[in-house]
Amino acid sequence: MKSIGIFVVALWLTHFCDGGQLGARIYSSGSESSVLLFDQYINKYAFTNGDVKIIYEGKSIFEILSETYVTDFNIFDRAISQDNLDMFQIVQFPLAGQAIVMTYNLPELVNSSYRLVIDRETLGKIWYGAISKWNDTAIQNLNPTVGHLLPDTDIILGYSDDYIMTISGLIKMALSSFSPEFDTELKYANNTFNGMNPTKNGRGHNIGETSTVRLEWLKKTSYGLTYINYADVYNNGTDSTVPMNMYNKAGYFVEPNLVSVQAAMSDFKIFYANNNSTIDIYDAPGNKSWPLAYVNYLGCSSAFGPMADCTRTIQMTNFIAWIYTNDAASESAIELQFYPLDKTLQKVAIDNLYNIKCNNIAVLSQQYLIGFGAPISVMSLWPNSWTTVASTARYYSAPSSQALELQETYGADFGITVTGVPNTYFNKMPDLGVMPLAAFTIVPAYNIPAINGTNGTLILDYEIITDIYLGIINNWNDSRIRALNGIEINRKLPNVSITVIYQAVSSDYNFMFTDFMSKKSPKFAKKIGSTYFPILTLPNNSMIITTDIYDVGNQLISNSNSFAFWPYFGITMLSRQPTVQAASIRTEKGNIISSNSTTLEKAINNFISKGGSIEDAPYIMGENDESWPLSALMTMIYRQSTIHYAAKAAAVADFAYWTQSNPTAINIATIQGMYVASNNPTLKSRNLNLLKNFVVDGEPISSIANCIYQGTICSDMGTCNNNSCLCNSYRKGIYCENIVSSSGESIGIILAIVIPVSFVICCIIIVLVIALIVSIRLHQRVEDEWEVDFHELDFMESLGSGGSGEVFKAMWKGTEVAVKKLVNSNITKDAERNFKQEIHRMTSLRHPNVVLFMAASTRPPNMCIVMEFMSLGSLYDLLGNELVTEIPPVLRIRIAYQAAKGMHFLHSSDIVHRDLKSLNLLLDSKWNVKVSDFGLTKIKDNNKGKSSTKEDSVCSIQWTAPEVLSEKQDIDYILADVYSFGIIMWELMTRLRPYIGLSPAAIAVAVIRDNLRPEIQEEDINLMSSDYVELVNICWHKDTMIRPSFLEIMTKLSTLIGGSGITTGTSTSSSNQSSDYIGPNIITRTKNIHNNDETKNSFGSTTYGSNTISSSSNTESDKILSKLNKKKIPTGEVIIVFTDIISAEQLWHHNPLAMKNATVLYNAVIRETLDKIGGYESFIYKDHNSGEGSFCLVFQEAIDAIDFCSISQKKLLEIDWPEELLDHPAAASEKDINGTMIFAGPRVRMGLHAGTVKIMQDPVTRRYEYSGVTVNIAAKITMMTHGGQVIMSEQVTDKISNNDCSNIKSLGQIEITDTNNYKVNIFELRIEGLIGRFFGGVAFYNYDSVTESTDLDDTYPDSLNFSTNGILYGGIKQENEYLSSAGLCRWIINYDDIQIGKQIGVGSYGIVNMGKWKNINVAVKKFVKQKIDEKQMLEFRAEIAFLSQLRHPHIILMIGACLKRPNICIVTEFMGNGSLRNVIKTTKPEWKLKIKMLYQTALGIGYLHNSDPIIIHRDIKPSNILVDDSMNVKIADFGFARIKEENSVMTRCGTPCWTAPEIIRGEKYTEKVDVFSFGIVMWEVLTCKEPFSGCNFMKVSMDILEGARPQIPSDCPIDFTKLMKQCWHAKPDKRPSMEDVIMGLNDMLGPEKSL
């Protein structure tokens, strides 16, 4: 039986089923004991990789073996033997440890917290029948506390005799190991429990194979005993099912837990290290080991193929790798009492992953480096910062000695030691590489609040330190301490006890400081000595003992007046303010020395120059008074020539070189007070030689090996490019080791002798010309690497506009890219030169969190930058997208971390952003964040102290630091970027727009004057944690010195997402993989979210014919929404329901505001009913806006769809519709002959059809669009339906044939000719209570092919078309032939009908182009922000409808609007002379014309103020006053205040020259703000100058608030001056009305006015 089972497994593993959807579905089965574990794994993995759907089913071993042809991998409780692994090319991986527990049900002990204890021998006797009673003496002796309670009752045993690869077989083997007698009896019984005495005596029962079954049996069986997985008992047990504790093989008492199971695994690690993955770990010999431990194994083929596509194999392998490397996987397993592998075993398992091959190529391409070593803070940041797409590094803290031992067994890819390498290890490992990476100091550290802030630090000497540790000095005010320190510190030293903190655990740092102090003080050597584990004899109230090797730093900062030796980097990482400080030391010669970069560097350089041994130095003692006396080398250890995998060795080499050469890596170490080894020439040379000799199979493995020569890179005379030297012009040779010799002189002599002088001159000229050409060609070649021909770019839709240009989506060489095209008006000679300089700068910037520069066109007028396309758009849009219903806190923090990482890189590269905001943080398809728009900025050193002019001002006021707003001198723009990042973190926390409702000027004034910041509420703190909020507050702090660097921000955010924090004891791992886990209690913010809509119309498509859904869009949004949206979407054969408001066009024309409100009410009823019934709202079409009157709804069950129609039709009668709308016949209330209300409000028709569909998914929101023939037929059925009527197809009624169908009436048959002459029998649903509705059949227009119906009089159109605004079915232009007929309103324009011309301006909306529509010249104002949510779109519809009705000779005619993305815009009449600003600037009009234009302007403003409702312009200025060819003026840019505000963050905002003071103060305002603006316009027209010229944004704002106004010319007429001053009065109530202004200007015009 066993051999048959193994054979079946082998057949499956070698065949490897390729079923399921490509790259989307992995099916597995395995033991029941692993169900809980895999449920957790699968849930967590969905947040790491949403591209793959993993299914796991727990089954019996025989079921597993019988269905191996349909599974992708299996999980076993036992290992497959090595013979079978080799024979059938199987690879298996130890997955997780579990504890089996003997579990009992004793009613007498139910109320007791005591657990019975059993030993191995006694347990064996119970199971072979020598002990049969619960009160047996052996059991009582083991449990004296409750022995008297044990009953004289039979022990009832529950078991399973399944043996193959089950824990029952493992239990038999364990019991045989426990008891020789049991082993003998088991063999007599043919290896079955069934044949042993307990069963023969009626006390043994075969109760089932699985642990869960045995647990259920035990719950019902008093006095029962069986073996169960501890995870099952822990998660599903009751008070009556209690697991036993045990005495293990070594005789020690143990409990089932993480420690005891991992100890058992560790006992067998030597077998795993030798690649033996077939062992069982029961009855382990260790002191802490659980006797009944076992390991789950995952098995799969090691040789897949031949296969056309290895994607599924790759996905499976990535999942296995994730199990071993993700912290969330380990943590969730531990919570359920499954125990992750020992870290060294994880490393072995990961290495085995590289043995999985597909088509003879290793499947796993990413290299996972595992390192162990001393707890060093830099090792929490270096791996995270280095990790690339191809490599991942993880670092775990362990003593240096353990790091060395793991190298011996290949248990780690690299190690870190801080105590050197003893010579004995070189004997064991001749190829051991020892590479110093950095050095650090170990310091006497103190936390004395009383002396914080004083000049200098506390001074101590070695004898004082000794006496502190011996308890001789126990007060900080001791006279000997005072004698060493100055007056200021002496005055503040407190009279309090010294609290000594030390580690009562073996520690590298213990050894270094005790050995050092023993050499400095004989007294210390005698009393304490050199030891890894010091023992102090201080009073308990004078010391704090910690057993955590990382916790000294935490204890120091948590306990005032404390003292300890600790690494310097450990105290710098504790807090922003120097609460814990390093004491200075007075040396034996009386000199005072402090720990700093200089004294550390001198200590290391002195040690190296004197030939100090790098390999075996436990620490470094400074030998002069300029060197810090105690420092240590942080040294990387690795196997120099025997690493098994070349790719892994290469990754180790690259990581090592990166730490020594990369500016980010060096900066990370330097900031933490470390000295990087590459700063020392000897160490740098030594390390390079080590990399040169780093080999696998004798071949150099480092990516720079071929460039290393005598400890240099290319002899320091060139650069290493693709592992070969590119020499400087005057050097040559493989390593640039030779100087280029000059033979020109001798050649010249020969030529002078041989050739006439004239020929020589000609040759020289030719050489010079050739040299010049070559130089030009070389320079051009460098530029050609990134220069692109503008005409190679295939431009697509606009993605948005910024301060310096517009961004387009484009295709370039078959790749989607983003192209930023510079505004032509900005391109001067200086701008062109600066642009090229910045491009050169950008070509060198490469970072995973910075948008990738790809190419550029530098030739005017088509200057542009080509960048990678970020498919998910900006963070600004994502946060405002209402369809992304939830973003988990951990993902928000990770987004912030990635953004900080990108900014840290820019700052490290000497680049400041100066326009950092959520709009400039972009997301790719995997939700990776990248910083954009940093180009075209200045290098920071050239920018400090410089101000931006108002022409350069981009409206990013919300994110701008107060010092930048106030134009202070010597601005640190690095810290200004940090301020902006604080606002972004607030946006991530709240998903709100900062300072919504305030004008830019009001924001700027409040930020500077009132220190205003966006509001943080209690719910924000609850959602994101107080630590996150604290980081926000210090980022946007007014005091720039308090703001952190981006490196500090990264560290804090890394801690919040489960990153390291080694020195403060928060974690021992530096994994770059966050734990993307969303707990069950996600807090949902209920605040209004502005700007919510789909981010893109980019869909992947998959056709589904089953209940299994999987996206092919490959986006990380699956991580979030696939788990947050628990509702299962309808798939397979579904019911499509269309709902549609008929006559919507008429109702919008009748009263736009009322129709807007009615549409909101209608949408709410449909969605509330849908949620109650359980359907799904589909996108109707990609370019169609939601919520316009039509819904496409999808149901899995027909009865649910019919119930929805009935309930919603009734609910629509209960709504309190707007009275103004009920005046229209298409919405009027109607009653039947009995007085029952049967109609009220807009009439809603509904059509239903059933069938299969095509489903496409949006990559951002994960919302699905349903399409196909079934949807089209449902839409056509809806088109023939009257308002208030519900019609369905026969395919729907067939699905409810078993229900009462008395309320369903047949209407006959129709033929739909555009779907292969599809004939449809249709039926009407008669809704109870609405029977009085009479329709007389269906509503046809010219429908044909209608048969077998007396009610169907007309014919049906023979084609299905889509109109641009409504959804048209057929060619007859009648309103109700459309779904969403709201799109047919006369003021809604099809963008394709407009011929777009040249750009003529940039306004508050965005870009303005000239155009032609129906042979009429028009102005097209296209919004920068194209993502408008449903609520805003309805408001926009209502406002455009209202504004299009306005008619006045002095306001611009609103022709209409285009409502479809990506071309949302408004269309107005075109004014030939442009703006008033342009006219007065270029023509200098005469006085009478000036007064005439002002008079007409006032008339236009007055009309707006007298409209109902009143229209306040808020932005009156000459650029918004347009002039026609006859010099008549019209007011433009009125209305759409909300959309203007949303768009303003993407466009230039200029200065508030025309803004009334009440707006700047953020107060409520009236139409008098327009009067104020008009007063400024009067001055501007008067003088033909720009107000407040030369003043920046903040000066203008403050001047207006302080009452400053433009200077009035002395020759200005008195009446004009008086009116102007009245208009711009500071107090609104003192300003005239526009009627008064009109009268005043009318008087100035006199009788000659010509209007």
Swiss-Prot record:
Residues 1135-1278 form the Guanylate cyclase domain. InterPro entries: A/G_cyclase, Kinase-like_dom_sf, Nucleotide_cyclase, Prot_kinase_dom, Protein_kinase_ATP_BS, Ser-Thr/Tyr_kinase_cat_dom, Ser/Thr_kinase_AS, Ser/Thr_Kinases-Pseudokinases. Residues 793-1057, 1394-1645 form the Protein kinase domain. One of its GO terms (molecular function) is ATP binding. GO terms for biological process: cyclic nucleotide biosynthetic process; intracellular signal transduction. Its EC number is 2.7.11.1. Residues 1-19 form the signal peptide. Pfam families: Guanylate_cyc (PF00211), PK_Tyr_Ser-Thr (PF07714). One of its GO terms (cellular component) is membrane. Glycans are attached at residues 111, 135, 190, 236, 275-276, 287, 452, 455, 477, 495, 540, 596, 722. It catalyses: L-seryl-[protein] + ATP = O-phospho-L-seryl-[protein] + ADP + H(+); L-threonyl-[protein] + ATP = O-phospho-L-threonyl-[protein] + ADP + H(+). The keyword Repressor does not apply. The active site is at residues 915, 1515. It is found in: Membrane. CDD domains: STKc_MAP3K-like. Keywords: ATP-binding, Glycoprotein, Kinase, Membrane, Nucleotide-binding, Receptor, Repeat, Serine/threonine-protein kinase, Signal, Transferase, Transmembrane, Transmembrane helix. This is Putative serine/threonine-protein kinase/receptor R818. It comes from Acanthamoeba polyphaga mimivirus (APMV).
